Amino acid sequence: MSKLRVAVLGVKGRIGSEAVRAVEAAEDMELVAALGRGDKLETLADTGAQVAVELTTPASVMGNLDFCVRHGIHAVVGTTGWTDDRLAQLKGWLAQSPETGVLIAPNFSIGAVLTMKFAQLAAPYFESVEVVELHHPNKVDAPSGTATRTAQLIAEARRKAGSAPQPDATVTALDGARGANVDGVPVHAVRLRGLLAHQEVLLGAEGETLTVRHDSLHHSSFMPGILLGARRVVTTPGLTFGLEHFLDLN
């Protein structure tokens, strides 16, 4: 069986360099390109890459994906900063290349994906739910893509269940004291030296609380999800948002 030809974009970052090692160690994959800032995207086509693992920046990701889709190269994307407009533009590109697949994953940690799923399942059974994400101080976006996605899934589950609005008697507050409001779910961001990537979902009802927490202690925790994404995206055309769709959780 021929090996899957994989390229990594963003190799100078911590997750990118870890992804290079993970692909090199995978028996069913061959690392054909490792690109950093300033390297030519044409290398992807020249080396016959089948999948590009995109781990760059919000400023670079759209240009990188435009190139990949135009050349029929599947993509596994961990870069954040996705808006409705950007997703619509990407879907437009994919419509012109219907056999190409793109996976965008707010988080590649299997445990983090399961945390989102557990929170989604539990949310309709509790009156109150809030999300707290905790990361290292070098993270450039807040709240994290994982926390935003978690809140969206929670809100969707509560809407489908017909849940009442969350109780909150706050009348006056300092700006930001109640966190960001994501579809009616408060999301709080902590930036602290010594942390990597952590999230907890706090759920409350009369007389009880439930906390669902996940901790990534090393960048290696993201590698099984990245490799899974690379293997599955080649047979999943179009746009897939969220690694949970490749985990058969339903």
From Swiss-Prot:
One Pfam family named in its UniProt record: DapB_N
InterPro entries noted in UniProt: DapB_C, DapB_N, DapB_N_CS, DHDPR_bac, NAD(P)-bd_dom_sf
SS bond list: none
Ranges in a coiled coil: none
Keywords associated with the record: Amino-acid biosynthesis, Cytoplasm, Diaminopimelate biosynthesis, Lysine biosynthesis, NAD, NADP, Oxidoreductase
Database matches in CDD domains: DHDPR_N
Pathway(s) the chain acts in: Amino-acid biosynthesis; L-lysine biosynthesis via DAP pathway; (S)-tetrahydrodipicolinate from L-aspartate: step 4/4
Gene Ontology molecular functions: 4-hydroxy-tetrahydrodipicolinate reductase; NAD binding; NADP binding; oxidoreductase activity, acting on CH or CH2 groups, NAD or NADP as acceptor
Major localization listed first in the record, in broad terms: cytoplasm
The enzyme's E.C. designation: 1.17.1.8
Entry's transmembrane regions: none
Function: Catalyzes the conversion of 4-hydroxy-tetrahydrodipicolinate (HTPA) to tetrahydrodipicolinate.
Family from the record: Belongs to the DapB family.
Name this protein carries in UniProt: 4-hydroxy-tetrahydrodipicolinate reductase
Gene coding for it: dapB
